UniProtKB/Swiss-Prot annotation:
Family membership noted in the UniProt record: Belongs to the protein kinase superfamily. CMGC Ser/Thr protein kinase family. MAP kinase subfamily.
Chain ranges of the Protein kinase domain: 21-314
SUPFAM superfamilies (alphabetical): Protein kinase-like (PK-like) (SSF56112)
Entry's free-text remark on domains: The TXY motif contains the threonine and tyrosine residues whose phosphorylation activates the MAP kinases.
Protein name listed in UniProt: Mitogen-activated protein kinase 1
Modification Phosphothreonine occurs at: T186
Binding site for ATP: L27, G28, K29, G30, S31, Y32, G33, V34, V35, K52
Species per Swiss-Prot/TrEMBL record: Pneumocystis carinii
Post-translational modification Phosphotyrosine, affected residues: Y188
SMART domains: S_TKc
Length: 370
């Protein structure tokens, strides 16, 4: 190991950290890799970070693009208060690497763990959380980006109730083709419980509204302290949505691409919409009205971020001067790249560029020059 790095073991994974950093503890493990908390012993104040080790980046092109997408979007959204901050990135050996370290803002918990806990949550908490999600989402959408994986575990929270959106690996651009729809979108999107019906039913087009559906699912989960549409499979997920929202009308069914999906829905008994006041009898009526606007089956009728921020439920927080838009559209041109080697070089270039911008410059030679 070179003199600029130290080795630690975190949850069975070797962590090779930049000198000066010490691991505090492991925070989580998933298909992407491992996350730990660490501290910079060379700095006295504000010295704790979360370090995400993304592993097996180049085992599949999809994973390589996901890593590139994540680091590019974290840089693009770096200055927003409701989006997690990227402090540094590191590649231990650019000449032969299959992993990447992201040094990010350390938060104390995620919304999923808070919902599952015994901690009392009030309507004021719900208002604050939903407002902050929408502020971050407005900024993301204004850059022509769909997050596509909003869920409680991707919402980081501190004890002071500050909330930040994380995990942009599944995000995609909005290439407008027809009306509000998108020209390009992959199937790999959003954990099923938070997935918009137009995604599940392969509507002829879909839009920013898919993220607003996820926000509605999160609001309902806050109100009930459990997932709202907890489908065990694809069909069960749809059926749970129909039981609450009622059976879709013919106008909505006609927007579905799949003939078999259309036939399935037409074969179902006609179900009425269930009033949210019966499901959440003690909830703030304004919260239920916003929920109704978010969990609207037809995406063209679903509320937008800007409209949701102006909803009476969030009036105590709403301040247009503190709800900025992104000054620059995000460029998804790299999505067209098919070569893993080209993606590898792009990751090296992004890490080197970022270090130059943030004062953490290290020399990253092009693989072609090593």
């Amino acid at each position: 190991m070179d003199s600029k790095h130290s080795v630690f073991n975190v949850m069975g994974q070797e962590f090779v950290l930049q000198k000066g950093y010490e691991v505090i503890k492991g925070l989580g493990k998933g298909s992407y890799g491992v996350v730990c908390s660490a501290k910079n012993i060379e700095v006295e104040d504000n010295n704790k970070v979360a370090i995400k080790k993304i592993t097996n980046i180049f085992s599949k092109k999809m994973l390589a693009k996901r890593a590139l997408r994540e680091i590019m979007l974290l840089q693009h959204f770096r200055n927003h208060k409701n989006i997690t901050t990227l402090y540094d990135m590191d590649i231990v050996d650019p000449s032969k690497f299959n992993e990447l370290y992201l040094y990010e803002e350390l938060m104390q918990a995620n919304l999923n763990s808070i919902i599952r806990s015994d901690q009392p949550l009030t309507d004021a908490h719900f208002q604050s959380f939903i407002y902050q999600i929408l502020c971050g989402l407005k900024y993301i959408h204004s850059a022509n980006v769909l997050h596509r994986d909003l869920k409680p575990s991707n919402l980081l929270i501190n004890a002071d109730c500050k909330l930040k959106i994380c995990d942009f690996g599944l995000s995609r651009g909005i290439s407008v083709n027809q009306g509000q729809g998108t020209e390009y979108m992959t199937e790999y999107v959003t954990t099923r419980w938070y997935r918009a019906p137009e995604v599940m039913l392969s509507f002829q087009s879909y839009s920013k509204a898919i993220d607003l559906w996820s926000v509605g699912c999160i609001l309902a989960e806050l109100l009930g302290r459990k997932p709202f549409f907890k489908g065990s499979n694809y069909v069960d997920q749809l059926n749970q949505i129909f039981c609450i929202l009622g059976t879709p009308n013919e106008n909505i069914i006609s927007k579905i691409k799949s003939a078999s999906a259309q036939s399935y829905i037409r074969s179902l008994p006609t179900l009425p919409k269930m009033p949210y006041s019966k499901i959440f009898p003690y909830a703030n009526p304004d919260a239920l009205d916003l929920l109704n606007c978010l969990l609207t089956f037809d995406p063209y009728d679903r509320i937008s971020c800007e409209e949701a921020l102006e909803h009476p439920y969030l009036i105590i927080w709403h301040d247009p001067n503190k709800e900025p838009v992104c000054s620059e559209q995000f460029d998804f041109g790299f999505e067209a790249i098919d070569s893993i080697e080209e993606i590898r070089q792009m990751i090296i270039n992004e890490v080197s560029r970022f270090k130059g911008l943030t004062g953490n410059q290290k020399l990253y030679h092009s693989i072609s020059n090593t």
